[in-house]
Amino acid sequence: MAMNKTKKLTTVAMLFALAIVLSFAESMVMPMFALPPGVKLGLGNVVVMYCMVYLGYSSAFQVTLLKGFFSFLTRGFTAGVLSTMGGLFSITIMFILIKLLKDKVNYYTLSVFGALFHNLGQLAGISIMFANTAPLAYLPVLTVSAVVMGLVTGATLKVVIPALKRL
């Protein structure tokens, strides 16, 4: 069933707020774990995946840009660029996977590839910003973390889908 414009706008706004709250909560909890620099769970991206699967690319794009802008406002230029680049790479691969694989794609596949491409987008952003390819040396660490964290966020999405569908 299609949503009217007002309901879709308010749903996207609530999902953006939820993504910000999840990201903030994650930033409070994750420092308790001894993880390599730059490795995060990405709970806010669970919301973006939900948008992609249930509301479409446009809504996922809107939430991604809003998250990037919020990062820019609260953490500065570099964080805003990295959030936006990672998010755009991530939703692009998810869109491609959904279009190519249709019903064969699952939350775990979307999440792992989304995490991998999020990391690639951030590495591309930092390499462009500093005109240096040295950050690419961190790719093996980020690849392993993307697979692990992607599986966790995929499982998280699967668990929270019933609650999110009620929005």
Residue ranges and their predicted role:
Residues 23-42, 66-94, 107, 129, ...:
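Interfacial aromatic-anchored transmembrane helix boundaries in multi-pass membrane proteins
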Residues 43-57, 93-98:
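Generic transmembrane alpha-helix motif of multi-pass integral membrane proteins
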Residues 19-23, 71, 90, 94, ...:
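Alpha-helical transmembrane segments of multipass membrane proteins
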